[in-house]
Amino acid sequence: QLLRNLYELQISRSGQNLTILGATSGDTGAAAISGLLGKSGVTVFILYPNGKVSPLQERQMTCTGASNVFPLAIEGTFDDAQRTVKELFSDLSFREEVGLSAVNSINLARILAQSVYYLFAWLRLGPAERECTTFVVPTGNFGNVFAGWLLSRMGITIKGFRVATNQNDVLHRLFHSGEYSLDNVVPSLAPSMDIQVASNFERLLFFILDGDTRRVREVMNSFLEEGRYCFENFAVEGFSSSSVTDREIPEIIHSVNREFGYLVDP
């Protein structure tokens, strides 16, 4: 994995061991642990919400037997785990002392690596198809779809990105009404998307506000303090959204499997 190789390079250059910290709603934690288990000079701590990831994902994180891996189940939601991780990263002296580094989308290297997936898919299309392609992306933390949007900012012509959410639809509500508002996390059949604070939206906001970091901080602080923020005339070219309920998810899985013989991951 790219991050593993980058960490090895960093350790060889600095001579300092790394403490890798991440929060996961299911997918990232298992992938990070798989890539870093048994690595010399690296200790991995992954926080995840107790009882809110799938049994398979939890086993993938907790049954490795690796001495450098510490999966930590916390009470609460993914948003609580993510907030804890961000608080630790904001302590600069602690971060330097333990060689703290991130493994989920807090780390921009993860986002940049994901943008390559979109380029690979785009290159496999014919010239006529490329300019009319819309990527539909299951979205919770807004990392993967933001990676695709970044690629379009680099000059690759992509028609659009459709943000697909489950019933935890903070992003769908944002794109439709301009209101970014907190709500309770509702457990769903798509637990990796059971998120109400989409951390990578802050990165999109940086572009929307023309790189005005002071204004970005004001908006995000207001959102976190008040639980909501209303944007006037909110629109980002190329983005659309939709959400589905727990009733619709199995219906769609069954329909796709019946018509195409493909079993969709919820």
Regions found by a protein language model. Name each.
Residues 1-266:
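PLP-dependent amino-acid enzyme catalytic core
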